[in-house]
């Protein structure tokens, strides 16, 4: 089905810079996210018929309700999307609209960049469709403003067609998903549903209830700096310690060598001097045992190095970030079975694969609300080559409507 306001709504959203800030200590991490919620989304939610629309300044969530119009549809279903965009330029987003894409290269604005099917073969899945791309200078923000636009448009459609019967619906738009803290302060009591869906997936058909389990690792290396001319048997180079530590991790267990259910260690930052160095890693795996084994391994490497050095010069700080939500959702697969049924009725093939990442649903599931993830359409997310198909977004709306009418 086509939805008249979808494209304009999406374009309006992506033009607002809501990039999150990993170094911020506030919630939301950037003022622009709160402004987006209060000045754009909240009035629009009220205008399309959502009730009890309210913003929580403590956790940055904007929530609204659409009560059921059929008392026999007793389930309560939630839909969640995040307002922030990833760590890439999001200022002056200038989307391009490619009608009836016929294949071949897409030049991104006046930049020297292009979407080339040889580099991005996923373009071949969208022949004949309307694509929204960047101009090559920013990301697009389909992750996750496509999800916001889809939820909004679905609600607008339902309130404009009161003869369509649906269950109770809760909507939540939250901050800071991209920096991993968006759901930390989520209040379950303010979102009373049986289960929910994040509209935060990628291509058509994605239905996901397995995520990584995730940990952040910070390793500090303490050296001893002396004049290099007299350094023999005295200098301890912290940078060399960092290199030694990194080389003790399995070389093939890095993101660029892994896929499917394989976990990894990912070095995300390395700074320092001879005197002191610091390495930042993320650790990811799907199975609980292998996730724990990865954390034990880095602890053991540090202990071994310290024993060899004769003193504690390698300091490890490990913090769990989120866990594989499969552990929660597989206890009651209702949300998955319902979504599969709706997709199949819409002639959409469910693509059930693990998310090599996390969603807000990872944390919210462990808070007591099973929250799998549904496709929102974005491709090549988090950079200048991001694009989305208007037709895939329309199909996501079809799924939302199907879910609440079948509940």
Curated annotation (Swiss-Prot):
Enzyme class, first EC level, given as a word: hydrolase
Residues annotated to bind Zn(2+) 1: 82, 143, 200
Known EC number: 3.4.11.4
TM regions (residue ranges): none
Cofactor: Zn(2+)
Cofactor binding: number and manner: Binds 2 Zn(2+) ions per subunit.
Any single GO BP term: peptide catabolic process
PROSITE patterns: ARGE_DAPE_CPG2_1, ARGE_DAPE_CPG2_2
CDD domains for this protein: M20_peptT
Catalytic reaction annotation: Release of the N-terminal residue from a tripeptide
Chief place of localization: cytoplasm
Binding site for Zn(2+) 2: 143, 178, 382
Record: active site: 84, 177
Keywords recorded for this protein, A-Z: Aminopeptidase, Cytoplasm, Hydrolase, Metal-binding, Metalloprotease, Protease, Zinc
Family: Belongs to the peptidase M20B family.
Protein's recorded name: Peptidase T
Species name: Streptococcus pyogenes serotype M3 (strain ATCC BAA-595 / MGAS315)
């Amino acid at each position: 089905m086509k939805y008249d306001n979808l494209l304009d709504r999406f374009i309006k959203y992506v033009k607002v810079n809501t990039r999150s800030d990993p170094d911020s200590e506030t919630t939301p991490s950037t003022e622009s996210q709160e402004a987006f919620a209060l000045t754009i989304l909240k009035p629009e939610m009220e205008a399309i018929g959502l009730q009890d629309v309210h913003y929580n300044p403590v956790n940055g969530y904007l929530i609204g309700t659409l009560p059921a119009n059929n008392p026999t549809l007793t389930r309560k279903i939630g839909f969640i999307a995040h307002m922030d965009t990833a760590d890439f330029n999001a200022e002056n987003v200038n989307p391009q609209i490619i009608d009836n894409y016929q294949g071949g290269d897409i030049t991104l604005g006046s930049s020297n960049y292009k979407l080339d099917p040889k580099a991005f073969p996923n373009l071949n899945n969208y022949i004949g469709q309307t694509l929204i791309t960047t101009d090559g200078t920013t990301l697009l923000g389909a992750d996750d403003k496509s999800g916001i636009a889809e939820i909004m448009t679905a609600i607008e459609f339902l309130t404009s067609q009161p003869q369509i019967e649906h269950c109770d619906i809760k909507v939540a738009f939250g901050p800071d998903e991209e920096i991993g803290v968006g759901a930390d302060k989520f209040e379950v009591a303010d979102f009373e549903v049986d289960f929910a869906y994040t509209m935060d997936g990628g291509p058509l058909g994605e239905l996901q209830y397995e995520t990584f389990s995730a940990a952040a690792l910070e390793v500090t290396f303490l050296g001893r700096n002396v004049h290099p001319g007299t350094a023999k048997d005295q200098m301890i180079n912290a940078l060399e310690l960092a290199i030694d530590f990194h080389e003790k991790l399995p070389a093939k267990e890095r993101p660029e060598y892994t896929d499917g259910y394989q976990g990894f260690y990912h070095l995300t930052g390395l700074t320092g001097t001879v005197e002191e160095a610091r390495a930042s890693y993320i650790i990811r795996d799907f199975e609980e045992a292998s996730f724990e084994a990865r954390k034990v391994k880095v602890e053991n490497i540090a202990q071994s190095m310290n024993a060899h050095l004769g003193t504690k010069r390698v300091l490890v700080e490990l913090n769990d970030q989120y866990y594989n939500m499969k552990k929660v959702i597989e206890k009651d697969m209702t949300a998955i079975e319902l979504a599969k049924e709706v997709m199949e009725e819409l002639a959409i093939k469910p693509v059930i694969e693990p998310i090599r990442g996390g969603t807000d649903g990872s944390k919210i599931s462990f808070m007591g609300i099973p929250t799998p993830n549904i496709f929102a359409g974005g491709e090549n997310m988090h950079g200048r080559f991001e694009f989305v198909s208007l037709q895939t977004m329309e199909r996501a709306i079809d799924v939302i409507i199907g879910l609440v009418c079948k509940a």
